[in-house]
């Protein structure tokens, strides 16, 4: 597992109050992990802070699963 993947999963678990082992790559933040709209905003903010990047709102709306978050970070930190 890449360190980015591990860090994203840790943040998701902390922000959404779920166990890290429940955070699967294909998991949807809303449907599988029980996030609401406020949770998703806070999650994006936590990812921005962790990876010292800014995620534009139009991109943040597309990040709906753990894997999409990992992909976004990988593509935009390079």
From Swiss-Prot:
Maturation and modification: 4'-phosphopantetheine is transferred from CoA to a specific serine of apo-ACP by AcpS. This modification is essential for activity because fatty acids are bound in thioester linkage to the sulfhydryl of the prosthetic group.
Main localization, broad class: cytoplasm
Record key words, sorted: Cytoplasm, Fatty acid biosynthesis, Fatty acid metabolism, Lipid biosynthesis, Lipid metabolism, Phosphopantetheine, Phosphoprotein
Places the protein is found: Cytoplasm
Gene Ontology BP, a term: lipid A biosynthetic process
All residue ranges annotated as the Carrier domain in the record: 2-77
UniProt entry tagged with the keyword Cytoplasm: yes
Chain positions found as O-(pantetheine 4'-phosphoryl)serine: 37
Pathway this chain belongs to: Lipid metabolism; fatty acid biosynthesis
GO MF annotation, one: acyl carrier activity
GO cellular component: cytosol; membrane
Pfam family, one: PP-binding
Family to which the UniProt record says this protein belongs: Belongs to the acyl carrier protein (ACP) family.
HAMAP family attached to this UniProt entry: Acyl_carrier
Function: Carrier of the growing fatty acid chain in fatty acid biosynthesis.
Protein name (Swiss-Prot/TrEMBL): Acyl carrier protein
Annotated source species: Saccharophagus degradans (strain 2-40 / ATCC 43961 / DSM 17024)
Name of the gene encoding the protein in the UniProt record: acpP
